[in-house]
From Swiss-Prot:
Keywords: Acyltransferase, Cytoplasm, Iron, Metal-binding, Transferase, tRNA processing. Substrate binds at L138, V139, S140, G141, G142, D171, G184, N276. Pfam families: TsaD. Belongs to the KAE1 / TsaD family. One of its GO terms (cellular component) is cytoplasm. This is tRNA N6-adenosine threonylcarbamoyltransferase.
Amino acid sequence: MSVDINILAIESSCDESGVAIYNPARGVLANQVFSQIDLHRVFGGVVPELAARDHLKRFPVLMNQALTQAKLNLSAIDVIAYTSGPGLLGALMTGATFAHSLAFAIRRPVLKIHHMEGHLLSPFLAPLKPEFPFIALLVSGGHTQLLSVKAVGDYEILGQTLDDAVGEAFDKMAKIMGLPYPGGPELAALAKNGDEQRFVMPRPMINRPDLDFSFSGLKTHVRLLIAEQNNDPQTRADIAASFQKTVVETLLIKCRRAWKKTGYRDLVVSGGVSANQALRAALQKNADEHKKRVFFPPLTLCGDNALMIAHAASFRLQEARIDDDVIDVTARWELSRLSTPL
């Protein structure tokens, strides 16, 4: 049974400031996100200190906007949740401090939420929901992991990247090609105009029986390819398309093995890269052909946001879990060690 409780959540793990309000019985009440893309564009990447300072400036405004959107007063909030890791320490500390200060001011309990658990559970916000147990593919700028998910909080890592995350690989390739920041979506857009068959690229670690990933060798291959090719627009588009095809095929091969290893029917794909249309199409096609099911977050929730944090907190409240009032943040935190204190 869904509980009628208003959860206000704070997200600040990287360069998106987020405040959301979620009620398990009534659904999404508010979701406010401010992206710092323009702030960091001139540097070609996220500057941690600038990110933390900008979060501090945005949170009061976003909170008021969220309360207005939800048509609630602050006194109607029952629980405060925040992202406590993993992420940039300064950015996390800004969000944690704001959350704890707010909780102290209105005398409400707090919940400390794992950022990637928020992503993992976000497909449950869509109308059609996965069923436990399922496989989770987490793909973002900082993570590439395959997990066995038996229940909320019961996560076993089946495989993960040994070097670059897939989102990081997209961004680095885009930067080498001179594409605007943020590069991942720009590379995917350029790939739509390219011939994905023109360049044959190595698919790292597909001949190994495990479920780990590696993208550094592919990145080096593409860098050398760019250096030896003409820099005309069509060649750039063809390289982008071939690179994207190679990454998608690599992820698909590992997901097939995870399906076979676990025997599960459902696959959940979350994180920023889950918005990639080529990846979605390939995984959906494979699932349809093999009588499996694949689930994605709504496109608006693929990036970092506070709604997924509030939503994850609602699952934790079902366990009657409330955290202490000590401010805790951590840059690294394995999902498989979620029950371990920070």
